[in-house]
Amino acid sequence: MSSYTMQLRTYIEMWSQGETGLSTAEKIEKGRPKLFDFNYPIFDESYRTIFETHFIRNFYMREIGFETEGLFKFHLETWLMINMPYFNKLFESELIKYDPLENTRVGVKSNTKNDTDRNDNRDVKQDLTSNGTSSTDAKQNDTSKTTGNEKSSGSGSITDDNFKRDLNADTADDRLQLTTKDGEGVLEYASQIEEHNENKKRDTKTSNTTDTTSNTTGTSTLDSDSKTSNKANTTSNDKLNSQINSVEDYIEDRVGKIGTQSYARLVMDYREALLRIEQRIFNEMQELFMLVY
């Protein structure tokens, strides 16, 4: 009950007095926009509603420290505009300091540079000897059969020309100059001469058929033995000069939770850090209310 001015709840509930059955939280939610109908700086816009609700609940039963609610709202706005930039920095530092889901952050950076010079000299001597023996035994049987048929025919004409002369010679006084049957030579003497000249012509026709069959059987055997012997000597020299330069950059960031502390505990610590800043704000805002209880 108010003794000097008016309680903050009177102003908040004034905006829902025509409605019945509302809870305190519902009444606060209806009156909150009427109380904070001005702008002021805050670190996170999503936190504005939470901060205003906590303010009303913290001073819900307290009497305002000014004659009228209008004067109270004026000084409330002035206080927030002057002091909230400072407290916003505290809120932001807590956000940087506390990630609600991690309790460790480790960063490792390393740079490694290696320069290596390598000289290799290698002498290699190799003797190779190989002996080989090969044997070949081959036998081949060949059989062949040849069958042939040859047939020939021919026709022609044969002419026989026969000349015959019979001479009888006695002693004579006169000489004859006669040629022989072939017209060559001279017969100088004959007592009696008989000549016969015969011409014969006949036609000829021949036909010949020949069948041939031949069988050939052969066997060949090949035996061969060979031996080989190879020797090789090799000598080599290898030289290798190499230079290796390597640079390694290693960057590691480890972020997370280490230890037995649960995620629920981490979130609770984060919220408590914000509430501690709120409590400092509300302690300093006591000057806006009557210092009587």
Swiss-Prot record:
Chain intervals with Polar residues compositional bias: 127-160
Keyword rRNA-binding: no
GO BP term (any one): symbiont genome ejection through host cell envelope, short tail mechanism
Biased composition (Basic and acidic residues): 112-126, 193-205
UniProt feature, compositional bias: Low complexity: 206-231
Keywords assigned by UniProt, alphabetized: Late protein, Viral genome ejection through host cell envelope, Viral penetration into host cytoplasm, Viral short tail ejection system, Viral tail protein, Viral tail tube protein, Virion, Virus entry into host cell
Localization per record: Virion
GO cellular component: virus tail, tube
Residue span of region Disordered: 106-166, 192-240
Record function comment: Forms the proximal part of the tail tube.
UniProt family annotation: Belongs to the phi29likevirus proximal tail tube connector protein family.
Protein name in the entry: Proximal tail tube connector protein
Organism, scientific name: Bacillus phage phi29 (Bacteriophage phi-29)
